[in-house]
Amino acid sequence: PNGHVEVNHAFLLSPPYVNEVYDSWEDDLKKGIGATKLLVIPMFPQYSESTIASGIDALAKELSKRVKIPTFEVITNFHRTHAFIDNSVIQVDSKIKELQQQGKKIDNLIITFHGMQKRRIVNKGDDYYRHCYETFCLITNKLKNIKTEKCTMRFQSRFGSEEWIT
């Protein structure tokens, strides 16, 4: 109502943890200064069970222990938003232009996404690969300093013996 927005962050694997941030919110609420609505934005543009869903699970687990539960909304992906795509294009285009001005030739631009086990997509129907592909297409189609056909999509961070998306 007063236009005040408070931004906090929480992590699953390191401090500040979800429960710590929630404790702080409850303390503020008791003082009459806490937000009445929470907007949860996981910092992964593309939805994946292993990232976004696990964050939602952690929040739900924390909510199940509490008496006061705020109104909340979860943004499950933002890979197609103009702000995300346009900012990505600006960053990539400016770096390419900088390299070209230094006399460097750009033969290929590789846009990488975090890797994921293939079973999550094939067996479970996870949207991650599709979201990554959409992100890749939306960015490369707007780039001014390199042709789309000189852009390649790849995945990184493979771990273990399972088959990973490529």
Protein language model features and the residues they cover:
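Extended amphipathic ligand-handling, pore-lining, and cofactor/metal-binding catalytic surfaces
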Residues: P1-T166
